[in-house]
Amino acid sequence: MTNNQKQQVDRSIIVGETSEVYLHRTLNILRNEGLNPFVTYEIESTDSGIVCGINQIIDLLDHVLPEADREVWALQEGSEISENEVIIRIKARFASFGLYETSMLGTLTSCSSWATAAHKCVTAASGIPVVSFASRAVHPSVAGQVDYSAYVGGCSAVSSLIGGKMTQTTPSGTMPHSLVLIMGETVRAALAFDRHMEKNVPRVVLIDTFKDEAEEAIQVGRAMKDTIRGIRIETPIERGGITPNLVDEISKKLEGCLLYTSPSPRDGLLS
């Protein structure tokens, strides 16, 4: 998946605040020596995966390279890459872009790593939609970037508002533990969610806060039989974590209560 929406280049990148000091020193030396050669500059991959960050680098180069006397070639955003493959090739005067090596490499490294990780999850899911909640695992200044990268990697949706804006998609989410804890009871929280959320928001209920997961799943299933879309399991490691056996147990108990009729846990109430 790709998104060609232009992203504004941060001023701190343009003025070189995010660049390493030795690049500033290099440009200073070359300037004093009267050297500004026309060069061919290539960025290669160090591993296989999904390339991401191309569009941001193109936006940066459009901003800093002269209109004439330049040539830029790059792979398409979201392309599968192999080890040592050329990702970007720039032909221009070194002084026009040499300062931005740090930003270009950092963008490609982080975004491609996130996109590749997302792609691995999507591949393992075998057709089941995967939603990125990665924004809670990074600094807020890059929350949009990690969600965008996950979307490029194949995720069907992202969780943050800025990620939704950058991918031009509707942010996706379920229920946090805080809502269930404040409401004091899982079914009560689920019914409040059902009452107050727009109809187009999937009713996916968190079921591991107070009681046994299967018990809570049955309770919310009965209370919201006509509207529930799925359940979310987030059992902490201290209680055994999320395991195939736990998923199978919940599935069988839901089937026994006629709340779950799909032939596979992947297709029905489980999330």
Predicted ranges, named:
Residues 1-95, 103, 108-111:
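Flexible, solvent-exposed loop/hinge segments and secondary-structure transition points
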Residues 17-21, 208, 234-235, 267:
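Acidic side chains
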Residues 79-81, 88-256:
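Buried, small/hydrophobic-residue-enriched core segments of structured protein domains
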Residues 260-271:
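Single conserved hydrophobic/aromatic residue that forms the stacking wall/gate
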